[in-house]
Amino acid sequence: MMKVLVVVALLVTHISYSSSEGIDDLEADELLSLMANEQTRKECIPKHHECTSNKHGCCRGNFFKYKCQCTTVVTQDGEQTERCFCGTPPHHKAAELVVGFGKKIFG
Protein backbone atom coordinates (compact mmCIF):
# COMPACT_ATOMS: atom_id res chain seq x y z
CA MET A 1 0.00 0.00 0.00
CA MET A 2 2.84 2.38 0.83
CA LYS A 3 4.44 1.73 -2.58
CA VAL A 4 1.21 2.73 -4.32
CA LEU A 5 1.05 6.00 -2.39
CA VAL A 6 4.67 6.80 -3.23
CA VAL A 7 4.09 6.08 -6.94
CA VAL A 8 0.92 8.22 -6.98
CA ALA A 9 2.76 11.08 -5.24
CA LEU A 10 5.57 10.87 -7.80
CA LEU A 11 3.10 10.90 -10.70
CA VAL A 12 1.24 13.92 -9.31
CA THR A 13 4.53 15.77 -8.80
CA HIS A 14 5.68 14.92 -12.33
CA ILE A 15 2.39 16.01 -13.90
CA SER A 16 2.30 19.31 -12.01
CA TYR A 17 5.94 20.00 -12.92
CA SER A 18 5.27 19.22 -16.59
CA SER A 19 2.24 21.50 -16.73
CA SER A 20 4.17 24.38 -15.13
CA GLU A 21 6.91 24.00 -17.76
CA GLY A 22 4.25 24.23 -20.47
CA ILE A 23 3.06 27.53 -19.09
CA ASP A 24 6.62 28.90 -19.05
CA ASP A 25 7.05 27.93 -22.70
CA LEU A 26 4.43 30.39 -23.94
CA GLU A 27 6.02 32.75 -26.41
CA ALA A 28 5.35 36.47 -26.70
CA ASP A 29 3.26 35.96 -29.86
CA GLU A 30 0.98 33.53 -28.06
CA LEU A 31 0.58 35.93 -25.15
CA LEU A 32 -0.32 38.75 -27.54
CA SER A 33 -2.84 36.47 -29.22
CA LEU A 34 -4.41 35.62 -25.87
CA MET A 35 -4.59 39.32 -25.00
CA ALA A 36 -6.23 40.07 -28.35
CA ASN A 37 -8.85 37.39 -27.69
CA GLU A 38 -9.56 38.95 -24.30
CA GLN A 39 -9.93 42.37 -25.92
CA THR A 40 -12.35 40.90 -28.50
CA ARG A 41 -14.38 39.34 -25.72
CA LYS A 42 -14.67 42.74 -24.03
CA GLU A 43 -15.89 44.32 -27.28
CA CYS A 44 -18.74 41.86 -27.79
CA ILE A 45 -22.33 43.03 -28.28
CA PRO A 46 -24.46 42.80 -25.09
CA LYS A 47 -27.92 41.24 -24.90
CA HIS A 48 -30.74 43.28 -26.51
CA HIS A 49 -28.29 45.47 -28.47
CA GLU A 50 -28.21 45.70 -32.25
CA CYS A 51 -26.02 43.22 -34.11
CA THR A 52 -27.10 43.89 -37.71
CA SER A 53 -23.57 44.76 -38.85
CA ASN A 54 -21.80 42.06 -36.77
CA LYS A 55 -23.97 38.95 -36.57
CA HIS A 56 -21.31 36.81 -34.87
CA GLY A 57 -20.24 39.35 -32.25
CA CYS A 58 -22.76 38.68 -29.48
CA CYS A 59 -21.51 38.21 -25.92
CA ARG A 60 -21.86 35.08 -23.81
CA GLY A 61 -24.73 34.69 -21.41
CA ASN A 62 -24.76 32.58 -18.25
CA PHE A 63 -24.59 29.26 -20.11
CA PHE A 64 -24.66 29.96 -23.86
CA LYS A 65 -23.47 32.61 -26.28
CA TYR A 66 -26.26 34.97 -27.31
CA LYS A 67 -27.44 34.59 -30.90
CA CYS A 68 -28.07 37.40 -33.35
CA GLN A 69 -31.80 37.23 -34.09
CA CYS A 70 -33.08 39.13 -37.11
CA THR A 71 -36.50 40.38 -38.18
CA THR A 72 -37.71 42.28 -41.22
CA VAL A 73 -39.04 45.73 -40.38
CA VAL A 74 -41.27 47.69 -42.76
CA THR A 75 -40.84 51.44 -42.44
CA GLN A 76 -43.61 54.01 -43.02
CA ASP A 77 -42.19 54.56 -46.51
CA GLY A 78 -42.79 50.89 -47.30
CA GLU A 79 -39.11 49.96 -47.28
CA GLN A 80 -38.15 46.62 -45.79
CA THR A 81 -35.02 46.57 -43.68
CA GLU A 82 -33.48 43.82 -41.62
CA ARG A 83 -32.95 44.62 -37.93
CA CYS A 84 -31.04 42.26 -35.67
CA PHE A 85 -30.43 42.08 -31.92
CA CYS A 86 -28.50 39.78 -29.61
CA GLY A 87 -30.79 37.53 -27.62
CA THR A 88 -31.32 34.11 -26.13
CA PRO A 89 -32.99 31.60 -28.48
CA PRO A 90 -36.05 29.78 -27.05
CA HIS A 91 -34.28 26.41 -26.76
CA HIS A 92 -31.44 28.05 -24.79
CA LYS A 93 -33.98 29.75 -22.52
CA ALA A 94 -35.58 26.35 -21.85
CA ALA A 95 -32.20 24.78 -21.06
CA GLU A 96 -31.30 27.64 -18.70
CA LEU A 97 -34.69 27.26 -16.98
CA VAL A 98 -34.15 23.52 -16.47
CA VAL A 99 -30.61 24.05 -15.15
CA GLY A 100 -31.78 26.82 -12.81
CA PHE A 101 -34.62 24.65 -11.54
CA GLY A 102 -32.21 21.74 -11.03
CA LYS A 103 -29.83 23.96 -9.06
CA LYS A 104 -32.68 25.05 -6.77
CA ILE A 105 -33.73 21.45 -6.13
CA PHE A 106 -30.31 19.82 -5.77
CA GLY A 107 -28.39 22.78 -4.37
UniProtKB/Swiss-Prot annotation:
Residues 1-20 form the signal peptide. Disulfide bonds join C44-C59, C51-C68, C58-C86, C70-C84. Coiled coil: none annotated. It is found in: Secreted. GO terms for molecular function: toxin activity. Expressed by the venom gland. Residues 21-41 form a propeptide. Keywords: Disulfide bond, Knottin, Secreted, Signal, Toxin. One of its GO terms (cellular component) is extracellular region. Its main location: secreted. Pfam families: Toxin_35 (PF10530). Belongs to the neurotoxin 19 (CSTX) family. 04 (U1-Lctx) subfamily. The presence of a 'disulfide through disulfide knot' structurally defines this protein as a knottin. This is U1-lycotoxin-Ls1b.
